[in-house]
Amino acid sequence: MAEEEEALRRHNQAIMRLKLFEKDISRIEACMGRYSIRKFPKAYVIANCSDLQEGLRTWFKLSSTIPGLDMAYFYNVLTYTGQDLEEKETQLLLYEGLEKGLGQEFNRSLYSMTEEPECIYTIIESEYTHPDFDMIHKMVQWAHKHGLEPMERVYANDMTSFFAKDKTTYCLEIYMPFKRIASPV
């Protein structure tokens, strides 16, 4: 009976992964190159890591101890100053609702939840796993044009990647909180 329950859980996790991928692809198709306002996703902060490499090591370690944690997303946290774009850390986030498919090994009380500020939102294609300064600067210009005052924090999620024209292209989901609505200029 235990074997069947474990097989069922693995099957349910596979379905959850497929639904996540389907949702990501739909969002890419709908939001690529468009700016909008969207709340930052509610998620469990599984780990705060110094950079993407440490995030990958942590992800592999956690995924091997708690089945299903491979569904965590890597959010690179950056700071935009108007002059520079600097990497701060990488967060491993597990979207709220996915914990239901992880089983008893996942103790949700051990993890804090993300805040859900309203953010300037877009999805962009990039040659890199991080956005560059110009990409974020364009986002800030859009915000100012619409009377929004962006904060310095930028969250970049590498949703997926593909190989085309002899290079890898990453689809980056970008969130940039704003602190107030200013008068449009």
Which role fits each region the language model picked out?
Residues 2-185:
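A solvent-exposed interaction/effector surface
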